[in-house]
Amino acid sequence: MIPSRPLPASPCTMAKKASQPLNQRRAPAVPPSAPSRDLQVFPNPAPERDYVIRFDVPEFTCLCPLTGQPDFAHFTIEIVADKLCVETKSLKQYFWSYRNEGAFHEKVTNSIVSDLVAAIQPRFVRLHADWFVRGGIRTFVTAEHCKKGWKPAPKIELPGAQ
């Protein structure tokens, strides 16, 4: 007869003993993200220079105001900042705030540009919205704002550059 000995503890058994009951777990140090229309800003680190900040937002969602069905869009935002830049996490939360809101494509696109202008007063902002196919029709909406008196520098084409 083989003498019995206790089985070694498995990683699963050890994890169960080490974990705390759900009602005794500590709250996270940073609260989880939540939708918000509050666009946070920070000082432009190079206000003396015109440069383009490009945001690619491939998963924007809102609701169709007529059917309540979700509408999806891919946004490309180009900004030439002046004194302020928009902080990306707050921009993510801002977009998230539209998730359960009903609005027409044109209204959403223009509202976002207006909110960005109000928050950072950029030299230039353009939002190109590629709304996914709905009823067999794909919609593209582009809205832009140019600060009065601002003139972009001429584009430089370099030989061999793509």
Stretches found by the model and what they are:
Residues C12-Q162:
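N-terminal intrinsically disordered, cationic/polar leader segments
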